[in-house]
Amino acid sequence: MSKLGVLLTICLLLLPLTALPMDEDQPADQPADRMQDDISSEQYPLFDKRQKCCGKGMTCPRYFRDNFICGCC
């Protein structure tokens, strides 16, 4: 009976160690890959595409409660 207990203990200890992924198995965080994800208002219409009215002789954009207002700089 003790041999069965030892075998069961060994199996229970080794199984979780092999079932868990190790750190080197994890994919590395790649900032370049995240930058390739194009999150633009053309793809996602819920994003507010803020217009620019700044330029020579023009006013700078202002936002009030997420509404676009052209105001003075």
Swiss-Prot record:
Sites bearing Pyrrolidone carboxylic acid, chain numbering: 51
Family that this chain belongs to: Belongs to the conotoxin M superfamily.
Pfam family, one: Conotoxin
Record has Magnesium as a keyword: no
Compartment(s): Secreted
Other information: Found in injectable (milked) (IV) venom.
Signal peptide: 1-19
Domain of life: Eukaryota
Alphabetized GO MF terms: ion channel inhibitor activity; toxin activity
Keywords: Cleavage on pair of basic residues, Disulfide bond, Neurotoxin, Pyrrolidone carboxylic acid, Secreted, Signal, Toxin
Propeptide: 20-48
InterPro entries on file: Conotoxin
Cysteine pairings via disulfide bonds: 53-72, 54-70, 60-73
UniProt note: domains: The cysteine framework is III (CC-C-C-CC). Classified in the M-1 branch, since 1 residue stands between the fourth and the fifth cysteine residues.
Protein name: Conotoxin CnIIIG
The protein's role, per its UniProt record: Shows a paralytic effect in fish.
Taxonomic classification: Eukaryota, Metazoa, Spiralia, Lophotrochozoa, Mollusca
